[in-house]
């Protein structure tokens, strides 16, 4: 690991400007820095020319915990380098999806090519091309971050000067260290009244192993210190290495689907060069394509003459099949191509599974096409067809976490205009039956009948960082979720890091919400897979009129089975409309009933037409009704409306939350 050295960065290179004057100040600064005395336009045009010498290129990304200001800092960099004019500028410029902008989070990593002219030091006045990749911060999108890091030589580690180091800060730091990237530590949001940069600079320096004076101070909101940061990127991040005269090798680090142009593939060129109209080959599949367009993103796509060593850009081949462009694959020339592929990415393993079903069964082909397209944009998504007795045809989908699941469903509904039902999320279990055969269960309906010998569930190593005053309540919560304490460290007298090993099934519902509520929102959580462990798990079936409804079945720990059964039977009693006959709602483990509620019958008034007369006439009508209800109860079916499914399944986690 290469640590920051050289000049101490404590003084700030620009005064803080008030909110109202921020845009003009940045615009003036950008024009002053990027326009020479004889130029009428900013020299951003030099970055539009490709085949830049590798010594003039710097590839870096911004990594941080969620909501520490990555996208806002990227906005200031876009303004400062002049690639976005004032009229086009908007907050979170690189966050292209509506969901990202509404929630204020980054989901997809975005790359952009920036021009920069260094203002001081031995490189003063020299022009450089910076490739910036803005990455997500949430634990569910760690795979996006790891792919972005593969395309870089350096990383800006951003920490909120008012909140300090959090769990995902450490997780992203370790990802960058694994790839031997240059780390530039930066404190953001120094303009906040609650900011304490001196304290958190010490924390950051302690973790990285540098001096507190080596930590840069910036404000993504006002633009303060951003120019100095870009100078430091040029000075500290090494240029890309590669052989210009070697056969072409380029790594696919992302791809998107464009409805008009087909698959758009984002690559980082490692060796050789790539030009339009040449034929390329994918080394994993051997498929060949003709390049229709090669270009750069600055920050809008711009066609170019090609890409050279170390450059990042996009390729368009006109291919419509989303499976032809696999993230992690190596692109080479169809003629005289490279013999050895680049090291690809580790395939992400889904940690949470859920069923997605169209409300209208005729939308099933549309759902399949939508998942195919989304799979190209989201390499971590997996899915396979499945059928449910209650919900019809759908897909069993694998996700990296609950937020990933929620975002995927929302994108399917918005971008492809689908109405969907999602079943309760659950994890992957390994079940050993009595006869020694082994099956993998991702769906409660796959759980074997009869006795099982052993069950293994996935476990994760969790890292929780919180104020030390909340240690007691955090430990109580983790122990109630079958967690085992692995260690505890004080980052400072006020902040503590707790490490637990916990079953993944215990944290995928409402663990994070419970953690936040117990710590007044101050705790942060990160987790990574840590193998599996033996567990006492059972399948709880929900029976309506004696028939199991597969959509409501769940795999839970033996100690929690009774609570789950009670919760679901009570909820369904409220949600399912009353019938002409009494309907028992039961929860069962195998043949043993553990909870029961009755949905009372609707009483039809058969005596309404009798205005008097003989009591035997009334008794005859009542006996006839009684016989009819008895017959209906034996042959009648209970139809559960779609609204009840949606309410029961979506409120599953919320029900847990309210009871704690």
Curated annotation (Swiss-Prot):
Domain (tr-type G): residue spans on this chain: 55-241
Subcellular location field: Cell membrane
Protein residues bound to GTP: 67-72, 188-191
Pfam families: EFG_C, GTP_EFTU, GTP_EFTU_D2, LepA_C
Gene Ontology cellular component terms for the protein in this record: plasma membrane
Biological process, per Gene Ontology: positive regulation of translation
Family: Belongs to the TRAFAC class translation factor GTPase superfamily. Classic translation factor GTPase family. LepA subfamily.
Molecular functions per Gene Ontology: GTP binding; GTPase activity; ribosome binding; translation elongation factor activity
This protein's UniProt keywords: Cell membrane, GTP-binding, Hydrolase, Membrane, Nucleotide-binding, Protein biosynthesis
Gene3D superfamilies: 3.30.70.240, Elongation factor 4, C-terminal domain, Elongation Factor G (Translational Gtpase), domain 3, P-loop containing nucleotide triphosphate hydrolases, Translation factors
Identification of the protein by name: Elongation factor 4
Function, in words: Required for accurate and efficient protein synthesis under certain stress conditions. May act as a fidelity factor of the translation reaction, by catalyzing a one-codon backward translocation of tRNAs on improperly translocated ribosomes. Back-translocation proceeds from a post-translocation (POST) complex to a pre-translocation (PRE) complex, thus giving elongation factor G a second chance to translocate the tRNAs correctly. Binds to ribosomes in a GTP-dependent manner.
Reaction(s) the record says it catalyses: GTP + H2O = GDP + phosphate + H(+)
EC number: 3.6.5.n1
């Amino acid at each position: 690991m290469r640590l920051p050295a050289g000049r101490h960065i404590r003084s700030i290179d620009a005064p803080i400007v008030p909110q109202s004057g921020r845009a003009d100040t940045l615009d003036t600064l950008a024009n002053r820095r990027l326009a020479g005395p004889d130029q009428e336009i900013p020299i951003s045009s030099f970055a539009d020319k490709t085949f830049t010498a590798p010594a003039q290129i710097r590839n870096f990304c911004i990594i941080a915990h969620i909501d520490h200001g990555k996208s806002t800092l990227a906005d200031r960099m876009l303004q400062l380098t002049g690639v976005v004019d004032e009229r086009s500028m908007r907050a979170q410029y690189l966050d292209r999806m509506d969901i990202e902008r509404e929630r204020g989070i980054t989901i997809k990593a975005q790359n952009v090519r920036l021009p920069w002219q260094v203002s001081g030091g031995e490189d003063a006045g020299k022009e450089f091309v910076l490739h910036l990749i803005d990455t997500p911060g949430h634990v569910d999108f760690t795979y996006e971050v790891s792919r972005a890091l593969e395309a870089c030589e350096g990383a800006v580690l951003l920490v909120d000067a008012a909140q300090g180091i959090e769990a995902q800060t450490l997780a992203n730091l370790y990802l960058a260290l694994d790839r031997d990237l240059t780390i530039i530590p930066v404190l953001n949001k120094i303009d906040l009244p609650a900011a304490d940069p001196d304290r958190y600079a010490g924390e950051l320096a302690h973790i990285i192993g540098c001096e507190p004076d080596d930590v840069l101070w910036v404000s993504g909101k006002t633009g303060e210190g951003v120019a100095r940061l870009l100078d430091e990127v040029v000075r500290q991040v090494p240029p890309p290495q590669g052989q210009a005269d070697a056969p072409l090798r380029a790594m696919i680090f992302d791809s998107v689907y464009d409805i008009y142009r087909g698959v758009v593939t984002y690559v980082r060129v490692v060796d050789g060069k790539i030009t339009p109209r040449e034929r390329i080959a994918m080394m994993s599949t051997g498929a060949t394509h003709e390049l229709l367009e090669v270009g750069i993103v600055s920050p809008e796509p711009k066609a170019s003459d090609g890409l050279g060593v170390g450059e990042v850009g996009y390729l368009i081949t006109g291919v419509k099949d989303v499976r032809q462009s696999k993230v992690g694959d190596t692109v080479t020339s169809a003629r005289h191509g490279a013999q050895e592929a680049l090291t690809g990415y580790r395939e992400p393993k889904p940690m949470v599974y859920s069923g997605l079903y169209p409300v209208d069964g005729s939308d099933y082909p549309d759902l399949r096409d939508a998942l195919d397209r989304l799979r190209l944009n989201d390499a971590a998504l997996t899915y396979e067809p499945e059928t449910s007795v209650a919900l019809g045809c759908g897909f069993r989908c694998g996700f990296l976490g609950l937020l990933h699941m929620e975002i995927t469903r929302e994108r399917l509904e918005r971008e492809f205009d689908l109405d969907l039902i999602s079943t309760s999320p659950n994890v992957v279990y390994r079940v050993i039956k009595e006869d020694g055969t082994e099956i993998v269960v991702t769906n409660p309906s796959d759980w074997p009948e009869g006795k099982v010998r052993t069950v293994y569930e996935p476990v994760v190593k969790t890292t929780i960082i919180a104020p030390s005053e909340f240690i007691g309540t955090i430990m109580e919560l983790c122990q109630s979720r079958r967690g085992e304490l692995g260690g505890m460290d004080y980052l400072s007298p006020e902040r503590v890091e707790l490490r637990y090993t916990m079953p993944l099934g215990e944290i995928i519902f409402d663990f994070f919400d419970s953690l936040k509520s117990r710590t007044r929102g101050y705790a942060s959580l990160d987790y990574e897979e840590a193998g599996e462990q033996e567990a006492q798990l059972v399948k709880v079936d929900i029976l309506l009129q004696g028939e199991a409804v597969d959509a409501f079945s769940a795999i839970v720990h033996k100690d929690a089975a009774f609570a789950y059964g009670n919760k679901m039977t009570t909820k369904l009693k409220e949600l399912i409309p009353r019938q002409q006959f009494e309907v028992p709602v039961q929860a069962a483990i195998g043949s043993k009933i553990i909870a029961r509620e009755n949905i009372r019958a609707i009483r039809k008034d058969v005596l309404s037409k009798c205005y008097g007369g003989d009591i035997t006439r009334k008794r005859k009508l009542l006996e006839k009704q009684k016989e009819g209800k008895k017959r209906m109860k034996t042959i009648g079916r209970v139809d559960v409306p779609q609204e009840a499914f949606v309410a029961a399944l979506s409120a599953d986690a919320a029900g847990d939350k309210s009871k704690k």
